[in-house]
Swiss-Prot record:
Protein name: Probable DNA helicase II homolog
Species this chain originates from: Rickettsia felis (strain ATCC VR-1525 / URRWXCal2) (Rickettsia azadi)
GO biological process: DNA replication; recombinational repair
GO cellular component, as recorded: cytosol; DNA helicase complex
Highest taxon, organism lineage: Bacteria
Length: 654
């Protein structure tokens, strides 16, 4: 355990300045690889060490559970600091709502559950169908995106202005949004957007509750501030408005999530929001070589809307940036696969320390083929995460309906899994009955069974299901969660259904369920597990053992990671910068594309390759390509520019 002077002396001068600033608003502009996590954790340790606040009065907010866990571990390695409030925006908001939900007078209780993205979309689809909305004109997925964006902006249906509903699609979305919120409240469930949205409503309508949390959280630290949306920004600003001891850490040059609601303006206007704010820049980079940093700085300097900063390093040496022209995207993939094979065979780098970062998903196919042909192990980062897999979501739905019998979405997911001969007509009859009486579908089934409204085979299967759900509900209050979930798997017939399939896929699903049971066994309270799984689904970053495999992933997914060698393919106009971004967002879109380029360049520690093709196959058509403008922004003196075609030139001399 270090004492105060020990951990302060491990910091560079700018880092020390940030750690020792303990009063008033602070914006910490932390460039890529400049040690921001070290500064954040040292700052928390210093606040506690100086007795400026107890750990319970410090709130640190991150965007992922992984980042929150890492921050807590690193703080505790510096100083005994138990009781800190470290978590994601959603987890902290959920905690506050569980304590204060009754003050919103929405009919919710503190046992509300948090529904997943898929369940949100299903509810939207159900409402669209019920309202007889033309899905060809008004796609449910698009309606759901609009509703989510409104929530990110802090807008409930009642707060939507005329300008928010100018277009026919927006007017339809508002109609669905109103019904969507009613359904959530009836079911005693919330979606992720509601957590902060209702937090802010709680604070606005109950000043005394806001004051309580302002007193509780006297020091606030927010990581990745450039990625915050409007509702997150408003939440943080309200909490910090009393003591103003807020430290926001971020890099406007790495704001690349505008497409999902992030507002780079939040970090750019920090000084206006918090009068007298101090701004400290972390510019000494500990990750990359000088040529890599020079390339990144020269590219990003072309953006106008940014806080000026220049990364530097005391490491003078470094490989020049390789910029390679290839005649096609297939040749580009073959060249990169061959170069990686050479780097690995010559023992210059391990395959696990090499990454290919693409701008768009369609670029990956040619690399898969090239690596298969060269027998190079590779890993494409993507696919379904654990808690998004079908069988896991099914079991979660069984648990949710057992805990909260008003959860319509959970009931509808499992009512015919395994098959119970409950047809669409019976389901619709239940929905209509419930809506007319403003009750949940489960309550409707119970009443309809008692009144003889359900006949023939559905009567027996529904009666059996209701009896079992009631039994599981009771058992959860007296038995260990793991025992009840095992009973659910057996009694429902779900496990038997998978076992009878006798396919590799079914066996894989059973293995996943067993893994889920191992996770449940770690929780004494099933509600804690449900909340944990919901928050993990929203924030989880795919964990991959890079081992000896080359990593292929998108530039967006690579943010926060680093590799010895990085290949950046497809640097062509229309591909990168994306033509769609330019067409839809103009100059704003171009600046975000340039920030994505900056993120890609700064992932490299030692070696960086940028490639572009003379022609590219896009949607089955071969298109002539031109080098990206971002390539022209990199100075010639730090690059080696070659063509993968030079080795073939001798064959065409006459």
């Amino acid at each position: 355990m270090l004492n105060n002077q020990d951990f302060i002396h491990t910091l560079n001068p700018q880092q020390q300045k940030a750690v020792l600033h303990t009063k008033g608003p602070l914006l910490l502009l932390a460039g890529a690889g400049t040690g921001k996590t070290k500064v954040l954790t040292s700052r928390i340790a210093n606040i506690v060490h100086q007795n400026l606040a107890s750990p319970q009065n410090i709130l640190a907010v991150t965007f992922t559970n992984k980042a929150a866990k890492e921050m807590a571990e690193r703080v505790n390695s510096l100083i005994n600091c138990y009781g800190l409030n470290i978590g994601t925006f959603h987890s902290m908001a959920a905690r506050i709502l569980r304590d204060q939900i009754e003050h919103l007078n929405l009919g919710l209780n503190n046992r509300f559950t948090i529904i997943s993205h898929d369940d949100q979309l299903k509810l939207v689809k159900d409402i669209v169908k019920l309202k007889d909305i033309d899905t060809k004109k008004y796609a449910p997925k698009l309606i759901h995106i609009i509703i989510s964006r409104w929530k990110d902006q802090g807008l409930l249906p009642s707060k939507l202005s005329a300008s928010d509903t100018n277009l026919p699609l927006q007017r339809v979305a508002k109609l669905v949004y109103e019904e969507y919120q009613k359904n959530l409240l009836i079911s005693n469930v919330l979606d992720f957007g509601d957590l902060l949205l209702y937090n802010n409503e709680l604070f606005i309508k109950n000043p005394e509750i806001l004051r309580y949390y302002q007193e509780k959280y006297r020091y606030i630290l927010i990581d990745e501030y450039q990625d915050t949306n409007v509702v997150q920004y408003l939440w943080a600003r309200m909490l910090a408005s009393l003591y103003k001891n807020i430290c926001c850490v971020g890099d406007d040059d790495q704001s690349i999530y505008g497409w999902r609601g992030a507002e780079v303006g939040n970090i750019l206007r920090f000084e206006k929001d918090f009068a007298g704010a101090t701004i400290i820049k972390l510019e000494q980079n500990y990750r990359s070589t000088l040529p890599i940093l020079a390339a990144a700085s020269n590219v990003i300097n072309n953006n106008k809307n940014r806080h000026g900063k220049t990364l530097w390093t005391d490491r003078e040496s470094g490989e020049k940036i390789k910029i390679i022209s290839c005649w096609s995207d297939k040749e580009e993939a073959r060249y990169i696969a061959g170069e990686i094979d050479k780097l690995v065979r010559e023992d210059r780098y391990n395959a696990g320390n090499i990454a290919i970062l693409v701008r768009a998903g369609f670029q990956t196919r040619s690399f898969e083929e090239a690596f298969i042909n060269s027998a190079m192990p590779y890993k494409i980062i993507g696919g379904l995460r654990f808690y998004e897999r079908m069988e896991i979501r099914d079991v979660l739905a069984y648990i949710r309906i057992s805990l909260n019998q008003n959860d319509n979405l959970a009931l509808e997911r499992i009512i015919n899994v395994p098959k119970r001969a409950i047809g669409a007509a019976s389901l619709n009859k239940i929905r209509v009955y419930a809506l007319e009486r403003n009750i949940s579908n489960f309550a409707a089934i119970k009443e309809m069974l008692e009144m003889g409204e359900i006949k023939a085979k559905p009567y027996e299967t529904l009666k059996d299901l209701v009896t079992k759900i009631d039994n599981w509900h009771e058992r959860f209050s007296i038995d260990a969660p793991i025992n009840v979930v095992k009973a659910i798997l057996d009694d429902s017939g779900y496990l038997e259904m998978l076992q009878e399939e006798k396919t590799e896929e079914a066996f894989g699903r059973i293995e996943n369920i067993n893994e889920m049971l191992r996770a449940i066994a770690e929780f004494n309270d099933i509600h804690d597990f449900i909340e944990h799984s919901s928050l993990v689904m929203e924030n989880e970053v795919l964990e991959t053992n890079y081992g000896g495999s080359v990593t292929i992933m998108t530039l967006h997914a690579a943010k926060g990671l680093e590799f010895d060698v990085v290949f950046l393919p497809g640097w062509e106009e229309g591909v990168f910068p994306s033509q769609r971004s330019l067409d839809e967002e103009g100059e704003k879109g171009l600046e975000e594309e340039r920030r994505i380029a900056y993120v890609g360049i700064t992932r490299a520690k030692k070696d960086l390759y940028i490639t572009h093709a003379e022609s590219r196959k896009i949607f089955y058509e071969i298109v002539r390509s031109y080098p990206s403008r971002f390539i022209t922004e990199i100075p010639d003196e730090i690059t080696i520019r070659t063509s993968s075609m030079k080795k073939y030139n001798s064959f065409y001399k006459f």
